[in-house]
C-alpha cells in the first residue's frame, strides 16, 4: 500500500533509532571494540538483520522507507527494486510490495554455474532500478552492486538503506561520484540521541561512543594493534 502521509524526517529518524534500540540491534562496547570488515576497531555495532523477526517494527520501517523514497526521489522514479545479497533481499521485497513494483536481487559475485548471473529475477534494459540494502558504512560495497545492475542496460541512480553510519564524510561524495544518491532512515547520531534520552546505556559508554563518532579515524588509530615489526 502506497503511503499518503509524510512524517517529518526528524521523527522518522527518532522512531527508527528507538526501534533499533528496543530490539537490541544496537551494541556499544568501547572497552572491547568490535572489528569492522576493514579490520579497524569500532565501539559500535548494529545488526539490522534482526528487524525481519519483528513484524510490527519491520512493517513500520518499510512504511518509513516508502515515504522517504516517494518524497525524496519521486512517485514515479523507479521501475524495479533490487536487493543486495544477502541482507538487502528481504527489505527489497518489502519495499517492492509497498511501491507495487517488481523485485530482483543482485549477487555479490556470479554463481559459477548455470547462467553464471549476478542478477536474479527479471531486470530489463532501460529500467530505473533502486538498490536496497540494510545499511552502509562508507558506501563502498554498494558500488559493485550498482555496476552489476548497470551491466544489464538498466540504470541505477539511487540506493536506500535503513541505517547509514553518517560518520565518514567521504561516503556521500564516493556515491555521488558514481552517480548514486543515498536515502536512509537514521544514523549513529540519531541512535546516540535516543540512547541518551532513554537511558539505555550508561553515561561513560555514551561519552566514549560520541568520541568515536566525532572523530572515528583518530579513535581507531589510537586502538590499532601494535605492529610487531616496529619494535625490531
UniProtKB/Swiss-Prot annotation:
Its cofactor is Mg(2+). The keyword Transferase applies. Keywords: Glycosyltransferase, Magnesium, Pyrimidine biosynthesis, Transferase. 5-phospho-alpha-D-ribose 1-diphosphate binds at residues 107-108, 111, 133-141. It catalyses: orotidine 5'-phosphate + diphosphate = orotate + 5-phospho-alpha-D-ribose 1-diphosphate. Gene3D superfamilies: 3.40.50.2020. InterPro entries: OPRT, PRibTrfase_dom, PRTase-like. NCBIfam families: PRK00455.1-3 (NF001729). Belongs to the purine/pyrimidine phosphoribosyltransferase family. PyrE subfamily. This is Orotate phosphoribosyltransferase.
Amino acid at each position: 500500500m502506497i503511503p499518503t502521509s509524510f512524517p517529518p524526517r526528524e521523527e522518522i529518524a527518532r522512531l527508527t533509532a528507538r526501534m533499533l534500540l528496543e530490539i537490541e540491534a544496537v551494541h556499544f562496547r568501547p572497552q572491547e571494540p568490535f572489528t569492522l570488515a576493514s579490520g579497524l576497531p569500532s565501539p559500535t555495532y548494529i545488526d539490522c538483520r534482526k528487524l525481519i523477526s519483528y513484524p510490527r517494527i519491520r512493517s513500520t520501517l518499510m512504511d518509513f522507507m516508502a515515504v522517504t523514497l516517494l518524497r525524496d526521489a519521486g512517485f514515479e522514479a523507479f521501475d524495479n527494486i533490487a536487493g543486495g545479497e544477502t541482507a538487502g533481499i528481504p527489505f527489497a521485497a518489502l519495499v517492492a510490495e509497498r511501491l507495487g513494483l517488481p523485485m530482483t536481487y543482485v549477487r555479490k559475485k556470479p554463481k559459477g554455474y548455470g547462467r553464471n548471473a549476478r542478477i536474479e529475477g527479471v531486470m530489463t534494459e532501460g529500467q530505473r532500478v533502486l538498490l536496497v540494502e540494510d545499511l552502509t558504512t562508507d558506501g563502498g560495497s554498494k558500488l559493485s552492486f550498482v555496476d552489476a545492475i548497470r551491466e544489464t542496460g538498466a540504470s541505477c541512480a539511487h540506493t536506500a538503506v535503513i541505517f547509514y553510519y553518517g560518520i565518514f564524510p567521504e561516503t556521500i561524495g564516493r556515491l555521488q561520484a558514481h552517480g548514486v544518491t543515498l536515502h536512509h532512515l537514521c544514523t549513529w547520531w540519531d541512535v546516540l540521541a535516543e540512547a541518551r534520552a532513554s537511558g539505555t546505556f550508561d553515561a561513560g559508554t555514551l561519552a566514549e561512543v560520541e568520541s568515536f563518532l566525532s572523530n572515528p579515524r583518530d579513535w581507531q588509530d589510537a586502538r590499532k594493534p601494535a605492529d610487531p615489526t616496529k619494535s625490531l
